[in-house]
């Protein structure tokens, strides 16, 4: 997944935790236009520069933008973190053209890490990480926290599900570590039993 240098054939899963919203959206928008399929998980952990009060005031100003005669015609004000991020990416893509619509269709966004993506290797994007891009000491807030302040009702539910997922993941890791240890022990015992026969096996590259 490198912009302009080639397309990865399989879908890329990006862990959005502690990435800056705009920087992450711009990189993903470019990849989508290049033909890459992208899944973004943990959207509630995306960072916005500026404190929570400031960001909430900005969002409340955005809520006042509507069509006077028929507000349901737009603009649509999303509350869920995944949909807010999706809209940010949409703003960086010519989504009203055929190419742009196809690019946007290649994007999937989620709060938390739902199956089957909990068993898939996830990647980060260094160019968008908060620790590398936000000035030290600068205020920031999480997108999930902002969403919960403006009408998103599932913040606590997602947090509970994430705790359960991490517990399952830790148990799986411990089991895998134990199996690796047993395998290494079994290989050592086999080497001691085989002795000189190992040289014969090595010569035929077994």
Curated annotation (Swiss-Prot):
Signal peptide: none annotated. It holds the Pfam family Ribosomal_L13. One of its GO terms (biological process) is translation. Coiled coil: none annotated. One of its GO terms (cellular component) is cytosolic large ribosomal subunit. This is Large ribosomal subunit protein uL13y. InterPro entries: Ribosomal_uL13, Ribosomal_uL13_CS, Ribosomal_uL13_euk/arc, Ribosomal_uL13_sf. It comes from Arabidopsis thaliana (Mouse-ear cress). One of its GO terms (molecular function) is mRNA binding. CDD domains: Ribosomal_L13. Keywords: Ribonucleoprotein, Ribosomal protein. The keyword tRNA processing does not apply. Belongs to the universal ribosomal protein uL13 family. NCBIfam families: L13_A_E.
